[in-house]
Amino acid sequence: MFLRISGRVRLNSHSLNAQGGGGTNYVEITKAKVSIKNDDRWEILEVPAISGNMVKHWHFVSFVDFFRETDYKDNLTERALRYNGARFGQETKAKKADGSEVELKDESEIIKNFADADVHGFLAPKTGVRRVSLVKTSFILPTEDFIKEVDERLVYAVKHNRVDIDEKGAIKSGEEQTAQMLFNREYATGLYGFEIILDLGFVGVPQSSPSNPVIEDDERKARIVSALKALIPMLSGYIGANLARSFPVFKLEEMIAVVSEKPIPALVHGFYEDYVEVSKNVVENAKKLGFEIEDFGYNVDFGESVSSVEELISKIIEKL
């Protein structure tokens, strides 16, 4: 099963991806440069961004949470229980969630024993074994039409303070004590586009020597379902840092999705103002070439209408 999703979310007062700030009292939000065409003139602009690495991490977190609810919960790396991705170092063996060890010599054995390495990929540099992630995420960026229409700065700073108290609950004072620690943190607001690709048809299938899946059908389905369900928290706001003190004022504005039993073209990123129309052309022409595709849309004229991310995922799971 192969799924492609693009769409747009409204994010107000978010600080989902920060950089720098070490040793300073100023925490800067991550930024990226984008190309925008105004009439016949191209511009390169710096905008706030949420990196694909951050988005992928939060899919990984939710995947682990959902997979731990299945009968195959021990088939995870021990690192996954701490939400660390399958980035092996110089070791030649890795521990499973149940404490047993697996040799990192063969891709088939690794993905058989580690669902997180199967779905999210891995690299074992000591043995030279690797696997490309089946989950691919783009940067989340302010949309080009939003950038053109809004003159306000997309990034702003808010001053915070931490109050230091003693064991009696009183605010500390004195030369060597800090009553208040002031710091500034950047936040951003805007309409953002995203794109996610899930190549779940390759779950359990070695990439080094493609063959039949090396895991049983029931576990394979459990891995696929967990990867699909992991999209639900992501598309409700669980996609970045600083969630405890500034959970994003998040709303999914629109979304398009296509699913097939075989690999299919990617949709156009939600960054582009014409992403729905161009994606529709991609799907229609792909169908003419023989691709069997089911298409879905939320708040847009695109394929079968769905009322939420949850309904989309439910419809896809029903087809497994």
Curated annotation (Swiss-Prot):
Record's keyword terms, sorted: Antiviral defense
Entry superkingdom: Archaea
Biological process per Gene Ontology, one example term: defense response to virus
Function: CRISPR (clustered regularly interspaced short palindromic repeat) is an adaptive immune system that provides protection against mobile genetic elements (viruses, transposable elements and conjugative plasmids). CRISPR clusters contain spacers, sequences complementary to antecedent mobile elements, and target invading nucleic acids. CRISPR clusters are transcribed and processed into CRISPR RNA (crRNA).
Family note: Belongs to the CRISPR-associated protein Cas7/Cst2/DevR family. Subtype I-a/Apern subfamily.
NCBIfam families: cas_MJ0381 (TIGR01875), DevR_archaea (TIGR02583)
Protein's name according to its UniProt entry: CRISPR-associated protein Cas7/Cst2/DevR
Annotated source species: Methanocaldococcus jannaschii (strain ATCC 43067 / DSM 2661 / JAL-1 / JCM 10045 / NBRC 100440) (Methanococcus jannaschii)
Gene transcribed to yield this protein: cas7
